[in-house]
Amino acid sequence: MSFWKNKNVFVTGCTGLLGSYLVKELIEQGANVTGLVRDHVPQSNLYQGEHIKKMNIVRGSLEDLAVIERALGEYEIDTVFHLAAQAIVGVANRNPISTFEANILGTWNILEACRKHPLIKRVIVASSDKAYGDQENLPYDENMPLQGKHPYDVSKSCADLISHTYFHTYGLPVCITRCGNLYGGGDLNFNRIIPQTIQLVLNGEAPEIRSDGTFVRDYFYIEDAVQAYLLLAEKMEENNLAGEAFNFSNEIQLTVLELVEKILKKMNSNLKPKVLNQGSNEIKHQYLSAEKARKLLNWTPAYTIDEGLEKTIEWYTEFFKK
């Protein structure tokens, strides 16, 4: 029987890329899922298919502690996946206060509501590779300091540290995830490099690279991310992992230019990318070691970058036909 059968699970950020895939997988595995939704996003992957009819939706925002407390109590929640965030770096630079409110205040509201709620057994908080800021040594491992410098990075460093506080001070069973750049069909943030490139190529337009093209990142396929989150939550108790942070990555690094050229090749396109060289406040080289997850969780990703990109291109090709 699935670990998740009849578990009462609360998911924030369920209209986002990761949240929508995670919710669907939890429902498939028999969980009773309740999602916190601020804005109605009808094009979200969450609303594709029948899963939406099998979950509860609580309307509200992370900034409203009373809404979160009510949801945890009324739906007798035992597991929380806190995925919601203002996740766009450019938006964060333009609107730091609203980003801090969503990402920092929102996180402590979730954790505080969980602290007061007696049924909570496990909380997973989505941090980010950006929480590390810029480090001299690569790849980043979980023992490196959290030292974001710009609004989005700092918001993730803070949320990450606050999560540790709730474990060390109150014994809250919380784990933190730090992933590379997530991608996959259903990401509607078209200022992100993969969906933007695919959209432009489908329209016959040259893809644009905001940076100089040499920035190195690791790209992590969404279905691998879902399995990583579920595995961590499942093993938290038996492996005594509360208070731990885990990097998840397929540990394949690409420059932005290499990534775009890979997509062009897979789409049989002769278009040439336009390198704009406008990237500001971005870390030049950033990628993660997932050795801890491999050792302690016996985790391995299922998808190569090529397999993930092929599935992603297929999704957007169908999406833009509608």
From Swiss-Prot:
Segments traversing the membrane: none
Highest taxon above the source species: Bacteria
Required co-factors: NAD(+)
Keywords for this protein: Carbohydrate metabolism, NAD
Residues the entry annotates as binding NAD(+): 8-36
One Pfam family matching this protein: GDP_Man_Dehyd
Residues binding substrate, per UniProt: S128
Active-site residues annotated for this sequence: Y152 (proton acceptor)
UniProt keyword NAD, yes or no: yes
SUPFAM superfamilies: NAD(P)-binding Rossmann-fold domains
Family: Belongs to the NAD(P)-dependent epimerase/dehydratase family.
Protein name: Putative sugar dehydratase/epimerase YfnG
